[in-house]
Amino acid sequence: MIQLSNVRKSYQIGKETFDVLHSIDLDIHQGEYVSIMGPSGSGKSTIMNIIGCLDRPTSGTYQLDGEDISSYKDKELAAVRNRSIGFVFQQFQLLPRLNAKKNVELPMIYSGIGKKERQERAERALEKVGLADRMLHMPNELSGGQKQRVAIARAIVNEPKLILADEPTGALDTKTSEAIMDQFTALNAEGTTIVLVTHEPEVADCTNRIVMVRDGNIVPASSGQRSVGE
């Protein structure tokens, strides 16, 4: 489903060029549950941004579901994001003036889905993540775990093939983090491909494959980790 081939990423700042990714090769198949780990500045978030069509590789190719999108323009990338990818972020990214249900409706507005269908699908998504009784609550009336569940509902409401989660438990306590990871595991069991970025080994251990990134390269996992990805 995801194929990065010889992907490099560099940034030009003034006269200096900074290489962030070096010849990344990564395959992730439909239905996999993969974590990307690495220290701060390793390049893991850059890989996530490229997979999520939020950034482009400087060179190399990126195929998503058999479609080479390496050279897509901004408008084309936005269409791919809205059609195929759901996002979950550490800080939830909920609009504070909209209730839970209306926050979940947002991706469908961008997709041009009618009001009645939007409402029905948002309700089903919130029920799926256990928030049937919180649909009309504002974000400031929800706990951290509930906010993240709203974010997950928003990510799945368009039925994407792929969910990308960037440090999804980073702002949560241990018990709430476990509940959120259970939610991802359940979604993956239904066939959704999930890729998450984390620096927490206990979170990565919930996934089926661990991709280790260091200094812009994919490297073998340490002996204490049960899986690696390339």
From Swiss-Prot:
PANTHER family: ABC TRANSPORTER ATP-BINDING PROTEIN MG467-RELATED, LIPOPROTEIN-RELEASING SYSTEM ATP-BINDING PROTEIN LOLD. Coiled coil: none annotated. ATP binds at residues 38-45. This is Uncharacterized ABC transporter ATP-binding protein YknY. It is an enzyme of class 7 (translocase). It is a peripheral membrane protein. Belongs to the ABC transporter superfamily. Its EC number is 7.6.2.-. Keywords: ATP-binding, Cell membrane, Membrane, Nucleotide-binding, Translocase, Transport. It is found in: Cell membrane. It comes from the Bacteria.
